Amino acid sequence: MEPAAIIAPQRARGEGRLVAKAEGGRTRIAELYQEGCAKIRLPKTFDASMEAVLINSSGGVTGGDRLSWEFRAGKGTKLTLTTQACEKVYKAAAGTAEIATRISVAAGAHVDWLPQETILFDRSALSRSLEVDLAADASFLAVEAVLIGRKAMGEEVRAGLFRDNWRIRSGGRLIHAENLALAGDIAALASRRAVLDGAAAFATLVYAAPDCESQLSKLRLALAGHALSGVSHYDVGGRDKIVARVAAADGFALRKILIPLISHLRKDASVPKVWTL
């Protein structure tokens, strides 16, 4: 009698890479690579910048899925990176989903990292990382938002795992690092005053640019009426950065806070159009 075959569960794999260069007064493609469920689309822009929309064609991630993204903004380029939709993290039968993102920004270049929200479902498991290398005079804006279930759908995350690790360097020197870990009954953790005080949506904003200090008062004014939010300015070895933490009751309320902040730091440019489709 032959042993029964063991069929491994199907898992999503994806790898995407985009390299941008400055040519003819515009930001253009130098290299584009996509494999598996990772897709990159480049909508038409009407200025010198480039916008890239990232797509996970598997429709979400679950235990054992692996996605890898790499972006390199060449000297003098301006690149906006966003996602087609919210990244949904579904119940994991086994294993942990992994998403790794690497971004390098050359001299005089600017990158906006503006993915739409990550939605955690009950019994989901995700570990993700963001590695950013900036030239000494490059600038960078990053916003990552997370929803702990969808409040309008009555969802709660009573068991799960979410790890989020950031490392941002400027001129080879570490200027920002954070390790977030939510494990177990995430809804109960979020209800604690020292964590989210009952909020089900939260975001981190990091801005590294020469004009950080001049932006601080306007950002504080924008957040003045939001008790669960705050913004600070830091000088790390001569490199300025702004860090804002925002929390809200749900995803809709979170967007109402975030969009004006993002627009202001993008010099009054709107958020990527896919955010409003």
From Swiss-Prot:
The keyword Chaperone applies. It holds the Pfam family UreD. It is found in: Cytoplasm. GO terms for cellular component: cytoplasm. GO terms for molecular function: nickel cation binding. InterPro entries: UreD (IPR002669). Keywords: Chaperone, Cytoplasm, Nickel insertion. Belongs to the UreD family. UreD, UreF and UreG form a complex that acts as a GTP-hydrolysis-dependent molecular chaperone, activating the urease apoprotein by helping to assemble the nickel containing metallocenter of UreC. The UreE protein probably delivers the nickel. Required for maturation of urease via the functional incorporation of the urease nickel metallocenter. This is Urease accessory protein UreD. It comes from Rhizobium meliloti (strain 1021) (Ensifer meliloti).
